[in-house]
Amino acid sequence: MGVTGILQLPRDRFKRTSFFLWVIILFQRTFSIPLGVIHNSTLQVSDVDKLVCRDKLSSTNQLRSVGLNLEGNGVATDVPSATKRWGFRSGVPPKVVNYEAGEWAENCYNLEIKKPDGSECLPAAPDGIRGFPRCRYVHKVSGTGPCAGDFAFHKEGAFFLYDRLASTVIYRGTTFAEGVVAFLILPQAKKDFFSSHPLREPVNATEDPSSGYYSTTIRYQATGFGTNETEYLFEVDNLTYVQLESRFTPQFLLQLNETRYTSGKRSNTTGKLIWKVNPEIDTTIGEWAFWETKKNLTRKIRSEELSFTAVSNRAKNISGQSPARTSSDPGTNTTTEDHKIMASENSSAMVQVHSQGREAAVSHLTTLATISTSLRPPITKPGPDNSTHNTPVYKLDISEATQVEQHHRRTDNASTTSDTPPATTAAGPLKAENTNTSKGTDLLDPATTTSPQNHSETAGNNNTHHQDTGEESASSGKLGLITNTIAGVAGLITGGRRTRREAIVNAQPKCNPNLHYWTTQDEGAAIGLAWIPYFGPAAEGIYIEGLMHNQDGLICGLRQLANETTQALQLFLRATTELRTFSILNRKAIDFLLQRWGGTCHILGPDCCIEPHDWTKNITDKIDQIIHDFVDKTLPDQGDNDNWWTGWRQWIPAGIGVTGVIIAVIALFCICKFVF
């Protein structure tokens, strides 16, 4: 009766009934009951999957390879410290692996080192290997070194991350970041996992900086690269340098570069001039949180003495540090100049010190700091030949200025010979002061500052800005481009303001809580385990933003797991390499033995005295540490089956599906009842 009645329905009622049936079918498919049958080919859920991944791996499409930067572990990123983690070695071929996703890197490196004879230390990058695409600061090091080996490897077993490729060696002139490669297991394979709008590079300096990407190149000169006596110089221009120290942050170096240009304290001769910073100077000036959109704002800086000592070339010859860096005048001898004359003694330039994007301690107050220059009496120091020479010490006093917001842009067409400061005052020349007088109190009149064109002339040969470094004022309040720490995700979505990055107290923390990923503010696209950027392969040269959502501590644990696993695998690699070498030597010995009937050591000599080391204890310790950190420690909401929520929440989808089916049956019954 029912079936016959349905078949005899009028056309309009049949359409209405069919519509309801399709709605019910779609509803049931959306909340379907899991009816799959587990068989032998189904991948089993391991303890690590339960504790860390919180899902089973049912398809390889759920795997995503991720490059994690070492700086997230809290390692030192300054050039003197970072280069100590690299070393040259021969006899080990390089290995290259690919990865799909990565992090924004605050510090990247680019090396161009030559041997004393002028030959290259590092190999050229093979076809297809490009520089790491997302670096806030690129530390470009040029110079010389002995380079005792064919390739430069990482002493701690990490990779050198390039654009979607990770290599075990450093390539010449190619930007890289230090890191490891790990794999994420996604809750379920989705083709649109990384779908979002592409990140477009800004084409000019007038675009909104919130849609652009910023990168700054900082140049250094090195002598004795790869040795314990390596010396580094921060390059202001081709002739002016500052002795580099581990305590110098990139932001401080940028301010230092700005100060050297605007105060006119650069070499005005044809020889090199080296400055040394007062060891009591606070080098955290200008430091700002990771990957905030850079704003060329000014902030209140406490009054302090910022002094530089000019180091004579007679006392320290640095002429041979870089064959690539020579004087513009080929007929000039750069090794015999004693450069004590930097600028005219009546120089009264007032310059700006930019905070490079970090908010002021008092968020609502922004000030323009000024530096007044004055000369101290020359200091007489004995030279290496027991002679004396005068070394001037320039005292730079920083004082408060009026509350202004500076909007000017920096371009790349810099002049390396101009000593014109980017900002001067018409309020009258500064009064010269000696070491016994109080600091200057002259203020900068914002109405009399020079135009941005003057600033562009002395922007500096050192720092190459791929994008305007200052577009927004201090009062704009707009958040960073598309980057934030995981701890600040809520602030990103709700529009809250970021706070300054806290100092890392422990020298070697287990994990840095301030992890920074390429993200998007589209909360609707959030799925998965962590905030991960995607470097392709949607289109060549176009980078896709992707959002993965997770609790704060999970990706931190994944990072540490990848780091410790990589170290253990590096020990395996070393043992395997030695075994391979040992086997080759044995093969050669056997070949010679069959031909010459001589003993192995008699034929090979000292080369036969090699044996593979036993790294079992080290590898076991690493594995035990991983088990202790991730298996023995239960993550939140991951208790045993006695936990009601943990044990029963897996039935929630099934319950919803059953409820949907019941509702569908009742609805169908009501429709039939209504029709008949």
UniProtKB/Swiss-Prot annotation:
Task: List all Low complexity biased stretches.
Answer: 414-427
Region (Mucin-like region) residue ranges read 305-485
TM spans (from-to): 651-671
Lipidation sites of kind S-palmitoyl cysteine?
670, 672
Q: What is the effect of changing residue 219 to K?
A: In strain: Isolate Bouee-96
Where are the residues of the annotated region Disordered?
314-337, 373-392, 402-479
What does its PTM field state? The signal peptide region modulates GP's high mannose glycosylation, thereby determining the efficiency of the interactions with DC-SIGN(R).
Question: What processes in GO biological process is this protein linked to?
Answer: clathrin-dependent endocytosis of virus by host cell; entry receptor-mediated virion attachment to host cell; fusion of virus membrane with host endosome membrane; symbiont-mediated suppression of host innate immune response; symbiont-mediated-mediated suppression of host tetherin activity
Q: Which cysteines are joined by disulfide bonds?
A: 53-609, 108-135, 121-147, 511-556, 601-608
What GO CC terms are in its UniProt record? extracellular region; host cell plasma membrane; membrane; viral envelope; virion membrane
| Annotated site residue numbers, Involved in receptor recognition and/or post-binding events | 57, 63-64, 88, 95, 170
Topological domains annotated Extracellular? 33-650
> Which segments does the entry list as coiled coil?
554-595, 615-634
Give the matching Pfam families. Ebola-like_HR1-HR2, Filo_glycop
Q: Where is this region: Fusion peptide?
A: 524-539
Which positions make up the signal peptide?
1-32
- Residue ranges that the UniProt entry lists as topological domain Cytoplasmic: 672-676
Family that this chain belongs to = Belongs to the filoviruses glycoprotein family.
**Miscellaneous notes:** Filoviruses entry requires functional lipid rafts at the host cell surface. Essential for infectivity, as it is the sole viral protein expressed at the virion surface.
- What name does the UniProt record give this protein? Envelope glycoprotein
**Organism of this sequence:** Zaire ebolavirus (strain Gabon-94)
Q: What gene does this protein come from?
A: GP
